UniProtKB/Swiss-Prot annotation:
It comes from Patiria miniata. This is Hematopoietically-expressed homeobox protein HHEX homolog. GO terms for molecular function: DNA-binding transcription factor activity, RNA polymerase II-specific; RNA polymerase II cis-regulatory region sequence-specific DNA binding. Pfam families: Homeodomain. Keywords: Developmental protein, DNA-binding, Homeobox, Nucleus, Transcription, Transcription regulation. The keyword Repeat does not apply. It comes from the Eukaryota.
Length: 280
């Protein structure tokens, strides 16, 4: 007994192909939908319906999607090169000289840079070269002899003499004190030419040398007075000598400056000669 076979619904592709007007009126395939490819190499519905060339390119078509993937895997586009900035000639020369030098030009020879005029002008250049700073600081007697101008920051500190104490008393260095003591051992009084020569040698003023010798003579007399007596007449003469020297300091210096003989009228010629021998 044979079974009855009822024909089923036709496939959608055949329905679309045989009923183009239905698709046109009901809008099953719109312009934005992907076309249904027909079997056996039949062209798409839109091509048959419109009777024109290939449809316009839209991002929703399969061919366009596949084509975009192929383009992505293809050769990359050359990256555009940005144009190099151009500078004036003086800026290029400064740029080249900066990299040719091993040391920054600002450290070797600082030059003032002008930024404009008025309130925004460049600050004044450095007072003097860096190599002259140690000489100006170490030199105790003439700190400005080796530099062209005075510094603007340390002016109140360097201008004050370094060997002066707060109370005005002079402080001599060890070398200066040794030279003065050595000279005092051989000569208790100095003539003006000798005082000038010694002051120049020790880099002191003549007034400082004169004051030092006066103080040293006063100390020397005080020490001799404190020595215990026990030798008779010699000790008595030693007691009288400091009083005579105190009176005749100024007159003796005048006599030495004129080159005359050392003669005093206080106690006679013999006493003056004995004083000179003991002082020597």
């Amino acid at each position: 007994m044979s079974t009855l076979q009822y024909p089923g619904p036709p496939p959608p592709s055949s329905m679309n192909l045989h009923n183009p007007h239905m698709n046109h009126h009901h809008g099953l395939v719109g312009p934005g939908l992907a076309p249904l490819s027909a079997p056996n190499g039949i062209q798409s519905l839109n091509t048959l319906h419109n009777g024109s060339g290939p449809p316009s390119h839209t991002p929703f078509y399969i061919d366009n999607i596949l084509g975009s993937r192929l383009n992505m895997t293809g050769p990359a586009r050359p990256t555009p090169t940005l144009p190099s900035p151009t500078f004036p000639a003086h800026m290029n020369s400064a740029y080249n000289s900066y990299y040719e030098q091993a040391v920054h030009p600002g450290l070797a020879a600082p030059t003032p840079i002008s930024y404009g005029s008025g309130a925004f002008s460049s600050p004044p250049p450095y007072p003097f070269a860096r190599g002259d700073y140690p000489h100006g600081l170490i030199d105790r007697h003439d700190p400005y002899s080796k530099v062209p101008g005075k510094p603007f920051l340390w002016n109140p500190f360097i201008q004050r003499p370094l060997h002066k104490r707060k109370g005005g008393q002079v402080r001599f260095s060890n070398d200066q004190t040794m030279e003065l003591e050595k000279k005092f051992e051989s000569q208790k009084y100095l003539s003006p030419p000798e005082r000038k020569k010694l002051a120049k040698l020790l880099q002191l003023s003549e007034r400082q040398v004169k004051t030092w010798f006066q103080n040293r003579r006063a100390k020397w007399r005080r020490v001799k007075q404190e020595v215990p007596t026990g030798k008779g007449e010699g000790d008595e003469n030693s007691h009288e000598k400091p009083r005579d020297l105190d009176r005749d300091d100024f007159s003796r210096e005048q006599v030495l400056s004129n080159g005359a003989a050392c003669a005093f009228t206080h106690g006679g010629g013999s006493e003056a000669d004995s004083l000179e021998e003991k002082e020597a």
